[in-house]
């Protein structure tokens, strides 16, 4: 068991406050149109159990399944075979605090595309840094 816990890699986590109402941020993370505008093309429906795909460009269609929906505060979905992506929203007057959590990282695993989790986690961590800024531009426009 200790080997399993040592192999677990820390979740990627970003918290940012957007100058936008919670409904606008919710639409950006919980609708296919919104998510496509700043992340990846997809066919998301914010309904628990809904299976959908993210179009991961050169990696192809990545299967996902919605696991938790609490509008407009929380959306979680499984992504690929190992990951979970969660968006937590908190209303702050006329602003919104978003916490993005990308979990399910394990040093002993590889993605469905054959890539080891450890270097992919580092790459994705940098990618999320840019994507939360892209989301900011979308919701604050």
Predicted stretch roles:
Residues 58-60, 80-83:
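Short beta->alpha connector loops
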Residues 47, 136-141:
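Short, highly charged C-terminal tails/helix-capping segments
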Residues 81-126:
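Beta-strand/loop substructures that line and gate deep hydrophobic ligand-binding cavities in soluble
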Residues 25, 35, 52, 66, ...:
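Hydrophobic pocket/interface hotspot
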Residues 16, 64-68, 84-91:
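Hydrophobic/aromatic beta-strand elements that line small-molecule binding cavities or substrate pockets
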Residues 6-7, 13-14, 20, 24, ...:
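Short beta-edge strand/loop motif at the mouth of beta-sheet-based domains
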Residues 72-80:
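Short, solvent-exposed secondary-structure boundary/capping segments
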Residues 1-22, 90-101, 137:
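Aromatic-glycine hotspot motif
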């Amino acid at each position: 068991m200790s080997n399993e816990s040592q192999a677990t890699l820390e979740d990627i986590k970003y918290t940012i406050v957007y100058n936008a109402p919670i409904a606008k941020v919710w639409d950006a993370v919980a609708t296919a149109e919104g998510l496509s505008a700043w992340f990846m093309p997809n066919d998301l429906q914010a309904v628990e159990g809904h299976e959908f795909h993210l179009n991961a460009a050169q990696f192809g269609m990545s299967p996902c399944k919605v696991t938790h929906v609490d509008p407009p505060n929380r959306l979680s979905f499984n992504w690929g075979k190992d990951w979970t992506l969660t968006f937590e929203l908190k209303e702050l007057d006329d602003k919104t605090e978003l916490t993005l959590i990308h979990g399910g990282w394990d040093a002993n695993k590889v993605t469905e595309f054959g890539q080891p989790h450890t270097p992919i986690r580092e790459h994705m961590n940098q990618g999320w840094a840019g994507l939360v800024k892209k989301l900011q531009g979308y919701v604050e426009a």
